[in-house]
Regions:
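Secretory-pathway glycan-assembly enzymes, especially type II membrane glycosyltransferases
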Residues: 1-206
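A short glycine/serine-rich beta->alpha loop
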Residues: 4-9, 250-252, 270-271
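A donor-sugar binding/catalytic signature common to diverse glycosyltransferases
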Residues: 18, 257-286
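Donor nucleotide-activated moiety binding/catalytic core segment of transferases
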Residues: 191, 232-269
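Short active-site oxyanion
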Residues: 205-209, 269-272
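Short, polar loop motifs at secondary-structure junctions
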Residues: 213-218
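Conserved helicase motor "Helicase C" RecA-like lobe of SF1/SF2 P-loop NTPases
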Residues: 222-233
Length: 286
C-alpha cells in the first residue's frame, strides 16, 4: 500500500497516514509511506518528508515500486511511471477522492492512497481477529501512534533539552490555541479560545503554562494575562489570517520540526487543554 501525502496541516497529514496504516493492516498489505512534493512540511530534496520526523517504516521506497514493471495498480490512474505525481486527478476524475473502504478486497498487487482517509471510517471494517476490533477511535489512534510513530532521536533530544531547561520541576499545563486561518474553518473560534482562557483562569496561580499557538495575537493576549507563567518555543507564528504552512518560508521542514517539538513537549506536561476541532489537539488528547 503506497501511502502518499494528503497535502494539508502537519497532524492532518499524520492522521491521514495513521488511517492508511490501519488500512494496510486490514488488507494485509505492506505499507510504504511517501510524503512527496505536495507535503507542506517537505524540504527541497524531493525525498520522503515522513523520514524527516519519524523512523522509516519500510526499507522499500517509491522508486523501488517504480522499477517493478509487473505491478497491477489500483486505482488505474496510476502507473509505475507516474507514482511521484502529486495532483493526479486527486479531486476530480477517474480514481479521485477514494475512501478507505474502496480499497478493501482489491486484487491488484499495489494500491495507492492519495486522498484523505480517517480511522473512524475504517473502524466498522476491522476484522474480529484484529487487536483493535470493537475499540473506541481514540484507543485505535493510540495503538497506531505507539506502533508506527517513532520520532527521530534528534527531535526527541530537542524535546528533552527544552523540557529540562524550561518546564522540569513545575506543575505544567499545556494549552493549544489556534488562530490565523483556523477561523475560516471554525466560525466561533474566538469564543472557543475564550473558553480555554476561562479554564486556565481556574487553575492554581503557580501553574506554568506551555502555550502552543500559531498566532502572535493570541500569544500577546496570554502574555498580557499570565505574564512570565507563559512558556513558548521559538517557532514561526503569523500575525494575520494566513496559516504558517502557507507562508513563503522556503523550508517546510522547519515548520514540521517546530510542530513536533511543541506536540511532544505538550505530552510531557501534567495536563492539557485545546480545541478539539484541531488535529493537533486531537492527537495530543488521544
Amino acid at each position: 500500500l503506497l501511502i502518499k501525502a494528503w497535502g494539508h496541516g502537519f497532524w492532518s497529514e499524520v492522521s491521514h497516514t495513521l488511517a492508511c496504516l490501519l488500512l494496510s493492516e486490514i488488507t494485509a498489505r505492506i505499507p510504504i509511506v511517501h510524503w512527496g512534493r505536495n507535503c507542506l512540511f517537505q524540504n527541497e530534496n524531493d525525498g520522503d518528508a515522513f523520514g524527516l520526523y519519524f523512523e522509516l517504516l519500510s526499507n522499500t521506497t517509491i522508486d523501488d515500486l517504480a522499477s517493478v514493471h509487473t505491478l497491477t495498480i489500483f486505482p488505474d490512474k496510476w502507473t509505475t511511471q507516474n507514482l511521484r505525481d502529486e495532483q493526479l486527478e486527486k479531486w476530480e476524475g477517474r480514481g479521485s477522492r477514494l475512501s478507505g473502504i474502496l480499497y478493501l478486497n482489491r486484487p491488484e498487487t499495489l494500491a495507492v492512497v492519495d486522498f484523505n482517509n480517517s480511522v473512524i471510517e475504517l473502524l466498522p471494517w476491522l476484522p474480529e481477529t484484529h487487536p483493535m476490533h470493537g475499540k473506541l477511535a481514540s484507543e485505535v489512534v493510540r495503538y497506531l501512534a505507539a506502533k508506527y510513530l517513532k520520532p527521530r532521536m534528534d527531535i526527541l533530544n530537542d524535546v528533552q533539552s527544552f523540557y529540562a531547561k524550561h518546564l522540569a520541576g513545575q506543575n505544567t499545563l499545556a494549552v493549544h490555541v489556534r488562530g490565523s486561518d483556523k477561523l475560516f474553518e471554525v466560525k466561533n473560534l474566538e469564543s472557543q479560545n475564550q473558553q480555554i482562557i476561562e479554564f486556565v483562569d481556574q487553575q492554581e496561580p503557580n501553574v506554568a503554562i506551555f502555550l502552543m499557538t500559531d498566532d502572535v495575537r493570541w500569544l500577546n493576549i496570554f502574555r498580557q494575562r499570565y505574564g512570565d507563567r507563559v512558556i513558548v518555543t521559538d517557532c514561526e507564528r503569523t500575525s494575520n489570517d494566513v496559516g504558517t504552512h502557507n507562508l513563503p518560508l522556503g523550508d517546510g521542514s522547519r515548520l514540521g520540526r517546530e510542530m513536533m517539538l511543541d506536540t511532544y513537549l505538550a505530552l510531557e506536561c501534567q495536563s492539557f487543554i485545546g480545541n478539539g476541532l484541531s488535529n493537533v489537539a486531537a492527537m495530543i488528547a488521544a
